[in-house]
Amino acid sequence: MRLAYLLLLLVAVLFQAGGGSAKPIMFFEMQACWSHSGVCRDKSERNCKPMAWTYCENRNQKCCEY
């Protein structure tokens, strides 16, 4: 019972750490593709080395190394 209470308390602290917002703490935030000198290409593109933790504004594209 104590373990469940401690886990619940930990979750509550993590969600309240953002100044009362309901966003959990993220250790790795997604970055825009262009901020890492990447290029957004169509998801069907075969000659693409994907970049981790990046995103494109168009959901039909993925971030590739330039």
UniProtKB/Swiss-Prot annotation:
Post-translational modification: Stereoinversion of L-Met-26 (in DLP-4) to D-Met-26 (in DLP-2).
Function summary: Does not show antimicrobial, myotoxic, hemolytic and cell-promoting activities.
Keywords for the protein's UniProt record, in alphabetical order: D-amino acid, Disulfide bond, Secreted, Signal, Toxin
Tissue spec. comment: Produced by the crural gland and detected in venom from the spur located on each male hind leg. Is also widely expressed in both male and female tissues, including brain, intestine, kidney, lung, spleen and testis.
Protein's name according to its UniProt entry: Defensin-like peptide 2/4
Keyword Amino-acid biosynthesis in annotation: no
Signal listed as a keyword: yes
Subcellular location: Secreted
Cellular component, GO annotation: extracellular region
Primary location: secreted
InterPro entries: Defensin_3, Myo_ane_neurotoxin_sf
Propeptide part(s) removed at maturation, as residue ranges: 23-24
Superkingdom of the organism of origin: Eukaryota
Signal peptide: 1-22
A molecular function GO annotation: toxin activity
Residues carrying D-methionine: M26
Record-annotated disulphide pairs: C33-C63, C40-C56, C48-C64
Organism placement in taxonomy: Eukaryota, Metazoa, Chordata, Craniata, Vertebrata
